[in-house]
Amino acid sequence: MDRYAEVTRKTGETDIVVKLDLDGCGVCDISTGVPFFDHMLNAFGRHGLFDLTVHAVGDVEVDAHHTVEDTGIVLGEAFCQALGDKAGITRFADAAIAMDETLVMAAVDISGRGQAYCELPVPTERVGSFDTELAVEFFYAFARDAKLTLHVRELAGGNSHHIIEAAFKAVGRTMRRACELDPRVQGIPSTKGLL
């Protein structure tokens, strides 16, 4: 089964192409024009073991908001497409990632219901030129368009870079586990028969 998607989105604010292979080995080619965000997407793909290409051009001269949020939308759509009917997937997963003083937990249910709940207090407004509140905006857009329920919670932390990076790694690892095929799962992993 080929669990791959390629999604393009072009608006007056952004032009984004995402290529996603759920059964990859963490090979990433990321270029969004937002260096810290590139670093986070690379961490997501590598720790999720997804082969991930993200090429985005946005109105970063305004700020990075449109680029980050729209990338979340397109990456979410790519996951939704690559998962297909979701037959045989594990569906539920969680992971806790430690990074020095920081501990962040993520949990997911690939439920067909797109929503995110993030408790990710970051002590500074910026990491370099990156507006730290955009991390949560990314997760909201991603969860909505991937049609999954996502929880991201900071359990400990002090360094803004560590908190955001641990969150992206935790979500990547959680998505890897939830998307994995389990040979014991017969059909759609739901008592309703669909997700």
Each model region followed by its residue ranges:
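N-terminal intrinsically disordered, cationic/polar leader segments
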Residues: 1-195
